[in-house]
Curated annotation (Swiss-Prot):
This is Reticulon-like protein B7. It is a multi-pass membrane protein. The keyword Phosphoprotein does not apply. PANTHER family: RETICULON, RETICULON-LIKE PROTEIN B7. Pfam families: Reticulon. Disulfide bonds: none annotated. GO terms for biological process: response to bacterium. The chain crosses the membrane at residues 80-100, 103-123, 172-192. It comes from Arabidopsis thaliana.
Amino acid sequence: MEEEKLEIVGPLEEPLMGNIVPEEINGLDSLTSSDSDSEKPDSPVPINAPIYRMFGRERPIHMVLGGGKPADVLLWRDKKVTLGLLSAVTVIWLLFGFGGRRLLTSLCRGSILFLLLSFLWSNALNKSPENMMDIYIPEKPLLQAASAMTFELNCAFATLRSIALERDIKNFVMAVIGLWLVSVIGNWFSFLSLLYICFVLIHTVPMLYEKYEDEIDPIAEKAVIEMKKHYQVFEAKFLSKIPH
């Protein structure tokens, strides 16, 4: 009897286990598939969305300005040097711009004062010339400034030459309008005042832009879009009618 029971029970257990196990596996598969489906986002979200930066730059403003000491001065990282430069240039502008002083006259009078002080130092006070402070202009910064100015002037001349020779009426008209606007601005200020304004802007605008670039860039993007729209309208109405 026991053998018969074993023979009967044995075949019955296999289909029971076979029916139970696949259902459990199917249940687990459905759970995992539903979990994976729920974990999938509904729509792809860009991780690294492009951020508009003025002039299409991809580097920090400090690196755009060349880095090093000049960039530190322009961005007010070295406040003592920046304030010293602005103060000195402001004094020079006030003396020669509003004070009515002449550069040659001031240089000659300064040289006379230097000669008098040197004479008193060496003769009346019986001081040796070796104890006097040497005054000289360093050569390297002047050469760098002259080289940079020469490069910019050559680029400007090359640009004007290419505009004059490429026979593109649109570029020619735009260049003439730009130069005319600069000449109008030049009538409002003297050359020394223009240099002073440019110097102050160079030493203030980069610092303010670096400080508030997250607020300035969206406004600049909207302004660029509007300017492009107005330029397209201007080109369609006027520039497109100019023969090539």
